[in-house]
């Protein structure tokens, strides 16, 4: 139901969680799935209870789907059985708190979401298939996560692509929407349409495409610097399979594909933001273990990640590894890395050498390099030369010599 009807939770059952990582974990045969959600704030408190709601229980709150608590891993967890491996299911976590109020959130590690406010336009214009799972209108509110325990696997035609010379890339920055869209017709600014023009891009002497942010962002019409779900690619441009087909086709033509990633901040739609949220101030709450209430630097928008938090570091590194392995991206352009710091600064001091920021970026680069030694990591940094030189010596590349010509 869309409203928060009266629900009396059962006493919380304390039990060891059978999985080691937060997220969605299908069984080997695909007939069951274990969900695990991290919940522990900076005051060492957690919500009063958590329930699963979704297509598997017709979105009804019930003690049958009340999640168990593992206080060692700080997880809420539950195993749902009777799953059809060939079917997509929508679901949310319903988090109950007498102190903070109740909230419905998706899973931060899900690979697809449904948006009741925006998906209908994608269906109407043929960008997202009408035959695919749709938003459960009238049964819940907010963004819905999707899982399938046995999805069809993509058959990569090129599985071993490598950048010939990472120091000699001619990069074409591409926004799917603007590259081919005609007027307001969403169906003309898609992955499918862009794929048709790869010959043109190659004719320019380009050997790498840098996709502007495509991880799930608020709305349908955006440059993508307002991310909310990092493991889900935005449906505004096409399906997961179409994203992979685009990358595969680029690799066939000798073109690397880099992804512009936005880890400085996220919108209030992100599950980590919603879990500990100050509704009076429209900001992340002081006890949120992932976000700062206010950015310590002067360049932030939306809600600023605390990159000193082990939780944030783990999340970012897990996401980088996922993108390299699942989509075979050849590297990344990191947006606004100057903001990866907890040291307070102003416009005059933000570019000064920051040793803690260097440590953070080296940590992320290690994950990239370990996962794919050929992958590149380009920083939009614009800090003092002593800091940029140290990052460059570590193997990272930096925007430099910028001009307006």
What would you call each of these model-derived segments?
Residues 91, 95, 100-158, 272-294:
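Core domains of carbohydrate- and sulfate-ester-processing enzymes
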Residues 110, 114, 153, 157-166, ...:
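Substrate-binding/active-site clefts of carbohydrate-active enzymes
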Residues 171, 258, 333, 378-379:
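Generic enzyme active-site microenvironment
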Residues 1-6, 98:
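Short, solvent-exposed loop/turn segments at the edges of extracellular beta-sandwich modules
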Residues 1, 87-91:
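Exposed beta-strand face motif in extracellular beta-rich ectodomains
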Residues 7-45, 134-136:
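Non-catalytic, glycine-rich low-complexity segments
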Residues 13, 35-88, 96-119:
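Aromatic-rich carbohydrate-binding modules that target alpha-glucans
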Residues 328, 355-405:
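Conserved alpha/beta catalytic core and glycan-binding cleft of carbohydrate-active enzymes
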């Amino acid at each position: 139901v869309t409203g928060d009807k009266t629900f009396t939770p059962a006493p919380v059952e304390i039990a060891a969680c059978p999985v080691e990582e937060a997220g969605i974990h299908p069984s080997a045969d695909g007939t069951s799935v274990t969900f695990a959600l991290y919940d522990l704030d900076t005051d060492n408190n957690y919500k009063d209870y958590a329930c699963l709601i979704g297509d598997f229980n017709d979105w009804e709150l019930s003690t049958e789907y009340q999640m168990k608590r593992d206080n060692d891993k700080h997880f809420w967890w539950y195993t749902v059985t009777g799953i059809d491996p060939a079917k997509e299911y929508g679901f949310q976590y319903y988090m109950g708190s007498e102190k903070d109020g109740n909230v419905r959130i998706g899973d931060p590690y899900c690979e697809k979401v449904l948006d009741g406010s925006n998906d209908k336009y994608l269906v109407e214009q043929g960008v997202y298939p009408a035959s695919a799972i749709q938003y459960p209108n009238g049964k819940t509110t907010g963004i819905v996560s999707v899982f399938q325990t046995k999805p069809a696997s993509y058959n990569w035609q090129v599985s071993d692509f490598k950048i010939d010379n990472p120091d000699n890339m001619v990069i074409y920055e591409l926004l799917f929407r603007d590259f081919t869209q005609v007027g307001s017709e969403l169906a003309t600014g898609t992955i499918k349409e862009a794929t048709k023009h790869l010959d043109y891009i190659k004719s320019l002497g380009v050997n790498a495409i840098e996709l502007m942010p495509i991880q799930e962002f608020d709305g349908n019409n955006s440059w993508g610097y307002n991310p909310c779900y990092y493991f889900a690619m935005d449906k505004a441009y096409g399906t997961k399979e179409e994203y992979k087909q685009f990358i595969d086709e680029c690799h066939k033509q000798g073109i690397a594909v880099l992804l512009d990633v936005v880890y400085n901040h996220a919108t209030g739609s992100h599950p980590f933001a919603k879990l500990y949220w100050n509704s009076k101030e429209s900001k992340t709450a002081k006890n949120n273990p992932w976000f700062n209430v206010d950015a310590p630097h002067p360049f932030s928008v939306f809600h600023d990640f605390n990159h000193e938090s082990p939780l944030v570091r783990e999340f970012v590194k897990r996401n980088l590894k996922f993108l390299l392995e699942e989509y075979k991206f050849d590297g990344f352009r990191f947006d606004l890395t100057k903001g990866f710091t907890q040291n307070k600064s102003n416009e005059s001091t933000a570019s000064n050498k920051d040793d803690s920021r260097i440590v953070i970026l080296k940590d992320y680069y290690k994950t990239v390099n370990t996962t794919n030694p050929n992958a590149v990591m380009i920083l939009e940094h614009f800090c003092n030369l002593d800091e940029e030189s140290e990052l460059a010596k570590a193997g990272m590349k930096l925007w430099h010599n910028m001009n307006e010509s």
